[in-house]
Amino acid sequence: MEIENSKKVVGSKQVRKAVTKGVAKRVYLAKDAEPHITRPIIEVCEQYGVGVEMIETMFDLGRACGIEVGTAAVALLKD
């Protein structure tokens, strides 16, 4: 998967910060994450024109990042 070998930030606060700074090229969100966490990220991604892709579970998203815990959000960073 593209996520593991890419430069990235993990976690909702870091993802929002990367999007607003203009350094995020794509955001991945877990479908099973709480809406109060994902909704603001989706809104800021729409505002800044960053694509969002949904991953089935927080655990799957964490594993795709090469970490052993779940995460709600990941942003791939521009080169």
Language-model region placement:
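Short, flexible micro-motifs
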Residues: 14, 25, 65, 69
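Ribosome large-subunit tunnel/peptidyl-transferase-proximal elements
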Residues: 1-23, 34-39
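Acidic beta-strand-to-loop metal/phosphate-binding motif
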Residues: 26-30
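C-terminal structural segments of small proteins and small subunits
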Residues: 50-79
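Signal for well-folded cores of large energy- and translation-related assemblies
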Residues: 20-24, 42, 46, 66
